[in-house]
A protein has these predicted regions:
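Carbohydrate-active catalytic/glycan-binding domains of CAZyme proteins
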Residues: 1-174
Length: 174
């Protein structure tokens, strides 16, 4: 409703580091933004991490960005294709975070894409926190040590890293 007003880019840190795939959610009466971005300017490699911050309104963060996930497992750090083709420098990826509440609402969940999207190893990881935990505390988040979706060559599944949750018309299924 009403007239759209372009408010501009949301500044995610004082150095104006690169940030993409932002999404917002409300949890326990507080609006949050999650996104992926760089820890610092790229020099000879790149690491995309997942950040979270609280929001003052839909276009302004009200807290510093907090790193809650960075690529650490081998399955999150694949950037070379099976044929040897690769990017010019290593790129380790946690990106495209999507928030989801567990069915009984006792867990806050963030699904994210991991590894290079240009590889068949692109997959989906999962972070979970207790629903009553401080979501800005990195220690609240537990990372699954294995991907929740990954390639399965026997069934011709390659690179299932894109994440989207769509409810059924009656809202009972996702």
């Amino acid at each position: 409703e009403g007239t759209f007003v372009m408010k501009g880019r949301i500044q995610t840190d004082k150095d104006n580091n690169w940030a993409i795939h932002a999404s917002t959610f409300e949890h326990d009466g507080q609006r949050y933004m999650i996104w992926c971005g760089w820890q610092k300017r790229r020099i000879d490699s790149e690491t995309q991490c997942i950040y979270i911050a609280t929001m003052k309104n839909p276009w302004t963060l009200s807290s510093d960005r907090i790193l809650i996930s960075k690529p650490e497992y081998e399955w999150e750090c694949q950037w070379v294709n099976p044929d040897g083709s690769k990017t010019a420098y290593p790129i380790h990826v946690n990106e495209a975070p999507q928030y989801f509440e567990s069915k009984n609402k006792d867990k806050a969940c963030i699904f994210y894409s991991a590894s290079g999207s240009w590889t068949p190893y692109y997959c989906v990881g999962l972070l979970t926190a207790d629903a009553k935990a401080n979501l800005l505390n990195p220690a609240s988040w537990k990372k699954s040590p294995v991907p929740v979706l990954q390639q399965d060559p026997e069934n011709n599944v390659y690179g299932p890293g894109g994440i989207s949750f769509t409810p059924s018309p009656d809202g009972k299924e996702w």
